[in-house]
Amino acid sequence: FFQAEDGIRDRSPSRGLGDVYKRQYAQARIMPAERLVSLPDFIEDQQAAAMMLQGMTVEYLIRRTFSVQEGQTVLFHAIAGGVGLLACQWLKQMGAVVIGTAGSEEKAALASAHGCDHVIIYDHEDIVERVNEITDGAGVPVVYDSVGKDTWDASIASLQTRGVMVSFGASSGLPDNFSVNQLQFKGSLYVTRPTLLHYVATRSDLLGSANALFEAAKNGLKVDINQTFPLEDTALAHRALEARQTTGSTVLIT
């Protein structure tokens, strides 16, 4: 059942609606209509469930937090995850060179299949050495890091002068003993800790982000739904995520 607020005219009860609210596992939910977006006909409901939050996260990271330009080389950690695989495809649409990190040969192969130019298996290879090798010692202008503690030092060391460290998660914990003075000595670097909430705070920003995602999907961006769990097995889904046993996106089915 769909009931629109008074004055809301651009939502249709005959078509699916998407949102990017976090921490919600439910069969039905009361939502403010201004925080919903209409889904285009070519995006199925399960696709939308997998791609809205992760896809709009990628949108703000690569288009607004740091606006990646054609020909630039970027380092993106956890490239075989849901956000990483979407980012890889979208960055390739933009003409970027993508260096990704992954935790296994299987995940590296998955990233390569999605267009990643260079995959570093961080359990077996030195990230900084490989980045310097790939960039002829120049480093990268931006690093996207959702891992945190385990990759922080390598991320900072992989940046070129005045490079940007985009820390958008900390799956391994927060870095130890980080001092802003390091930014000066490492090359006048920038560090930012963005979150999607502040990039879709207005309806205009929300629609702009969603429409950019839908356009990328129309141009071939695909979401990999590699795991599905019944809603009652949510705990199993969390255990799989915590054990790093998942790739791509995970969807709960009601």
Task: Enumerate the language-model features and the residues they cover.
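Hydrophobic/small residue at the entry helix of a nucleotide-binding pocket
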Residues: 83
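NAD(P)H cofactor-binding loop motif with strongest signal on the N-terminal glycine-rich segment
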Residues: 78-79, 147
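C-terminal hydrophobic helical "lid"/dimerization subdomain
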Residues: 203-254
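Adenosine-nucleotide cofactor-binding segment
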Residues: 92-151, 202-205
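NAD(P)H dinucleotide-binding glycine-rich loop of Rossmann-like/cofactor-binding domains
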Residues: 19-78
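Short, small-residue-biased leader/transition segments that mark boundaries at the very start
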Residues: 4-21
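N-terminal Rossmann NAD(P)H-binding glycine-rich loop of SDR-like oxidoreductase domains
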Residues: 80, 88
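Glycine-rich phosphate-binding loop and adjacent beta-alpha segment
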Residues: 150-219, 254
